[in-house]
Amino acid sequence: MSTWLLPENIADVLPSEARKIEELRRHLLDRFRSYGYEMVMPPLLEYIESLLTGGGHDLNLRTFKLVDQLSGRTLGLRADITPQVARIDAHLLNRQGVTRLCYAGNVAHTRPRGLHATREQIQIGAEIYGHAGLEADLEIQQLMLDALRLAGLAKVRLDLCHAGVLAALIEAEPAAAELGQSLYDALAGKDVPRLVELTANLTPVIRDALRALPRLYGDASVLDEARARLPNMPAIARALDDLAFLASQVDGAEVMIDLADLRGYAYHSGVMFSAYVDGVPNAVARGGRYDHVGQAYGRARAATGFSLDLREVARISPVEARSSAILAPWQHDEALRVSVAALRDAGEVVIQALPGHEHDLDEFAFDRVLVERSGNWVVEPRA
């Protein structure tokens, strides 16, 4: 086996792709800051007990585990930054009011989440803590759509779901609670035959409601059908009202309702949402409310947020990231050195062509050149 062979679904990021990813990262973090979000940087490794707190079965399966050579305890290589940020808010910052936090960093998955998906994502996201009202959910959704627009993804479809619907049905039927992960997997995968099999022995009202969820998909009018087909429970009524309000407020995206889009249900407690674009089978961004996660770290806090994979969004983004630059010669000239330094201080990209390599610079678009005119170095358009 070649010594330079990388593991499956792990890849290097080469200059052109890396430049596009980094430019997008900077733009998104600047936009998050314009909304008032503060940057945090959780560690790549944590003790497994802390890393998986409140994360559910799926997060456990996706997390690489190793032994700490100092303590002998098990460490986890993070697969999701969101629970780490919840820990920071609940345990370290300990603020009483609304807190807005954002982050960007690498995460690793034991298995790819799609056929061609990478197992090392660059996750970027934003979270609001301390406000239980729908205003926070709406702000997060607007910020996510704003981020996707910055990436050049204009035609976005926003799918809305609510964890409270399934939670209410399970709470009303103890036998449904015993089905646990199998029921969730069947719903998330829209595996209707499996769902029929699992619900065969449930009471008719709960059985029919669970079987209806995969079919409750469409525009906002599907909420009227949901009210007719689902049991008249206060929790379900509130969930459907929340979805109706948010669907009416979203600007700049097609809104769809999908009451079986339950990926991430394990730690979500309210509204859940996913963003899709044409030509990409999987969601390009996901988010939702997870009010109970902070409680696992010692302090219950209302929380909602979203995240996306920078590598995937940069890959599908039509925004051109080829950097324009100034081409300068390589000479032992003090005036040239001063001119180049001044241009770089002003934010310009200046590349000095090393002798014999004047044509090895295809990664950059040289629209200007630095030339000597009457003893002065000046920037001119490149012919």
Swiss-Prot record:
Q: Under the cellular component aspect of Gene Ontology, which terms does the record hold?
A: cytoplasm
Task: Please give the Pfam families that the UniProt record associates with this protein.
Answer: tRNA-synt_His
Supply one GO molecular-function term.
histidine-tRNA ligase activity
Q: In which pathway does it act?
A: Amino-acid biosynthesis; L-histidine biosynthesis; L-histidine from 5-phospho-alpha-D-ribose 1-diphosphate: step 1/9
For this UniProt record, the keywords arranged alphabetically read as follows: Amino-acid biosynthesis, Cytoplasm, Histidine biosynthesis
Q: Where in the cell is it found?
A: Cytoplasm
The record's listing under InterPro entries reads: aa-tRNA-synth_II/BPL/LPL, HisRS-like_core, HisRS/HisZ, HisZ
Q: Which GO terms describe its biological process?
A: histidyl-tRNA aminoacylation; L-histidine biosynthetic process
Q: State any further remark.
A: This function is generally fulfilled by the C-terminal part of HisG, which is missing in some bacteria such as this one.
Described purpose of this protein according to its UniProt entry: Required for the first step of histidine biosynthesis. May allow the feedback regulation of ATP phosphoribosyltransferase activity by histidine.
Tell me its family.
Answer: Belongs to the class-II aminoacyl-tRNA synthetase family. HisZ subfamily.
Q: Which HAMAP family match?
A: HisZ (MF_00125)
Q: How does it assemble?
A: Heteromultimer composed of HisG and HisZ subunits.
Name by which UniProt lists this protein: ATP phosphoribosyltransferase regulatory subunit
